[in-house]
Amino acid sequence: MNLAQDPSEADGPTFSRRFVRSVTLVSGAGQVADFVLPLFAGAVLGLTAAQAGALLAVGLATSFLLRPLGGVAADRYERTTIAAASALVLGAGYVLVAATATFPVVLAGVLVSRAGGAFLWVALRATAGARHQVDPRAFARLMSAEELGAWVVLAPAIALLAAAGYAPTFAAAAACTLIAGVLLASSRRRASTRGSGDVDAARADPLVEARGAVVRGLAARLRPLLAVVTVIGTAEAAVGLLLVLHLQRELGLEPLAIAWVSLPGGIALAVAPPHLHRLTVRYGRTPVLVAAAIAGAAFAGGLALARDPMTIAVLWILSALALAAILPIEQAALTEAAGPARIGRALGLYEATTLLAAALGSLAAGILYDAVPWAAACATSAAVILVGGLLLPQVIRQLAPMQAVG
């Protein structure tokens, strides 16, 4: 899968190979940390479930608060420089976790890594947002590079965890981020992605920024889209966690077996975005979004009837295809609505919104799993996904130029 057909220029119509590889490495490292940290908290630190949850919540809160600031930075400063420095900070956080089994140091590592990740991902998405003006495939390509990390980095890391333990696994994640930082820095020397460049966002008037009127207006303009993103993201996160709980507690699968069940969906999520973008170009956003909403709802509803891991794996592919269609369209619509001078701020708000949705979805999943039958929990998630997905085209149509909606 060649995501970067132009091997040299990061600011041309496509991303450079160095940029793509760095995205894959940092994405895979982040997925490793997300998978391993809860296990590490219980097995090595001896934390209770509530304490482990609090540790994760503090990290997520840090990321949530810093992502809008990352958007401000991405609009004012060199985005590749921000991404490279943030990748190094992310790696430093993983090094702290790998180096010791004492809670204060691990907490510091979690906070440092979440801070680095907040600035990193906003800068990377803002780079894609700037590319979107000359290459509408930019967000689909970025998503493919991200999801490639799930089976290029995460799958070997699970094997490393089983063979060598937690510290080497976190060290490997740190190595991935440090290599990514070097790749980003080297691509910065070869091709600038400056916020005030021809392709990237222009800098805003500092006097206007000081008043904050434009930022507040941007938030108000994007509020309907961000609200729908929150609804869909909450339902998707809820059904994802519900499924993991079901596989673990009802079907008795171990973490490695759960990873194998999710692998076909992960591969689909990495491969599908550019192909689904072609369908979006051919048929328009509205038909693709409606089809994706139906596919996502079919995944959630079908889980109520699925009784074996093979069927669940097939259904997981439906969910992956839905996300591969919806997420690049959401990000592209947000970029178009924000305008070139506010790409970073808009995507900072978007990143914070998706993080909030993930937190709400996790909370909802826990409540649904304990309070209602499995079939009712799946049906509830399916209904929310379908309604949110059907609302999304109308919300996007109100934001974007008519020719971009289709």
Residue ranges and their predicted role:
Residues L111-E146:
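Cytoplasmic helix-loop-helix junction between adjacent transmembrane helices
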Residues T81-V95, P287-G301:
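Structural signature of the two symmetry-related core transmembrane helices
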Residues L66-E78, L161, A272-R285, Y369:
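Helix-to-loop junctions at the C-terminal end of transmembrane segments
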Residues A10-L60, R221-V228, I232-V261:
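Helix-loop boundary and gating motifs at the non-cytosolic
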Residues T169-A185, C378-P393:
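Symmetry-related core transmembrane helices of the 12-TM Major Facilitator Superfamily/SLC fold
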Residues R342-D370:
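A late C-terminal transmembrane helix in Major Facilitator Superfamily
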Residues L60-P68, A150-W151, G266-P274, A358-A359:
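Residue-level signature of mid-helix packing/kink "hotspots" within the transmembrane helices
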Residues N2-T14, S187-A227:
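Juxtamembrane intracellular "pre-TM" segments in multi-pass secondary transporters
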